[in-house]
Structure formats: structure tokens, C-alpha cells
Amino acid sequence: MFYQLLHSVLSLVGILSNAFMMYLALKKSPKIMRSYSVVITIKTGTDILASSMSFFVMQRIITDGSSIVVNPTGPCTSFGKSACYAGHMFMLCFLEYDLVWLITSYLFRYTILRGRELCIKKLVRIAFYVFIPSMVHMGVWISIYILTESESVLKGFGIETDDMILSGEIIYWSSITLLTQLFITACLAVVAYTFIRKSLSKFARKMSVIKTNEKNLRNRLVKVATFKLILPSFIFLGITVFVAMFTRLLDYQYGQYIVSVCFMFSPVCSPYAYIIFVPHYRKFIFGRKENVPKLEQGQCETPESPRNTPNLPYIYYI
């Protein structure tokens, strides 16, 4: 009961906080931030979907190395096992895409540092293209799902036979595959963070003679990027707990509740990076004036802007 309550609260907070952040991105972003507001909107939309799927399934993931059992306890149980398995796959897929888009947002910052800004249409196309592999992979697993479970497995994990459980070869290999992909994507997100941080440090050294308010952009960018490093950390923690159960270093009676909860903290915490560190959003929430430069909106792409020019204040807002 407590697990379901905790799951419900985290899911609700994730949905509401990301919906609020999406509203800020769409309605309260300055014109200079129009392109980046699309990045934020896609990110928060993915987080809303991940939180919704988490609430829909409310799953416990149990393993002892020889088998993997998913025990859904959410609203999906009213629609059958196939619906719960689809929700399980959708949640993992959205978490993976969330990390992929996090990497994309780091690369977006880098393109701006290089004096180029992608237009909205290109950003939407990129978002669609990077989502295709995850959707195809997830669709294949769902299409070959077979309703199978073993009573011996249920008794071994102490699960009542009247509980809805998902088990079998498809559950085992699809979970292993997607969790491995999550781990690899989280590692790539850390690599992307390291790359953008080094780029920002070089950019800061070039700004040694620029006025103070523009120097602050490096610190803001680093703070946002560092805060977002928390997101793959939750994925790492959830996968670590799963591996500990898989290798029998951790009793499944404790680990089964931790994996999904750790995953949920990633979409829950994501919007606060923008709320805390982006001046315009903070100003709207707290009603405080922010000292930001007045700038003209950038073009879709500005190759005429010198790539090595350190004076690129329009990324101050990001």
C-alpha cells in the first residue's frame, strides 16, 4: 500500500511539475529563447509520458538472476497483462528517450557556442528521428510478447497466484535489453556532460574581457548541465539495485521496490534545472527582477557569426 502511495505521489509530482515547466517554455520564454524552448518542451513532454506510464503500471521488478518477474499493481491491471507489458515497455522507452534528448540538448548548447542556432523545424525533425529507433525496438518486443508464467517462479518469489505477474523468456530478455540500453545511454549522457563542460570552460577563458553579466552565462550553463547530471545518476542507481538483485547481492524483498522508484526521480527532478537556473522562469515564479541583456532574436542558422567569437550572449538564457 505504501509503495503504491509513493509511486502515485512521485508520478503526480512528475506530471504536474513537467506540465508547469512546459507551460513556462511555451508561454513565458523570451523570443531569444524560442528555439531552446522547443528543446525544453520536448524534454518535459517525454517526462510527462514517462511519469504517466509509471503511474499506469506501478510495477515492481523482481529477479534472482535465473528469471525476471514484473509485478504491476497500477491501473493497467484492469486492462490485462498485455496492457501492463506495453506500459512497462513504454516507461523504459520514454526513460531512454529522455536521456537521448538530454544528450541532444547538450549538443544544442554546443552548436550555439559555435555560433549557430538550429531553427524550430530542424529541432522537431531531430526529435522525431532520434525517437524512431526506440519506438521500433519497443514495438518489436510488444508484438512478440507471449502470456507465459511459471508457478514455480511465483512460489520462489513468494508471490500470490492471484497477483498479476509478467514473466517468461520475453520478459527476461526484453528487460535485460532495455535496462542495458538505459545504462549505456546514461553513460553517454555523462560523456556529453563532460564534453560540454570543457567547451564552456574554454568559452569562459575567451570571455575574459567581456562585461560581467555576460561572464555569468558560463556559470549558469555549467549549473544547469551539472544539475542535469543528477538525472542519469538515478538511472545508474536503479540499474545498480537491479544488478545487485540479479547477482543475489541484495535480497529481492528489498530491491523490488527500489528500482522503479529510482527511475521515477529522473523525470521528477528534471524541470527544476530550468526553474532554478533560467532567469526568465525564476523571475516569473518568484517575481524577482533579473539583470539580463536585451538582445535581438537569432536566426535559424547564423553561419555569418564568427565561430570563434566569444561574444555570444544570446545563450545566456539557456
UniProtKB/Swiss-Prot annotation:
Origin superkingdom: Eukaryota
Transmembrane parts of this sequence: 5-25, 38-58, 88-108, 126-146, 176-196, 226-246, 258-278
Record-linked Pfam families: 7TM_GPCR_Srd
GO CC term, one of those recorded: membrane
Keyword list, A-Z: Membrane, Transmembrane, Transmembrane helix
Presence of the UniProt keyword Transmembrane helix in the record: yes
Keyword Transmembrane helix listed: yes
Subcellular compartments: Membrane
Membrane topology: Multi-pass membrane protein
Family: Belongs to the nematode receptor-like protein srd family.
Name assigned to this protein: Serpentine receptor class delta-25
Organism: Caenorhabditis elegans
Gene of this entry: srd-25
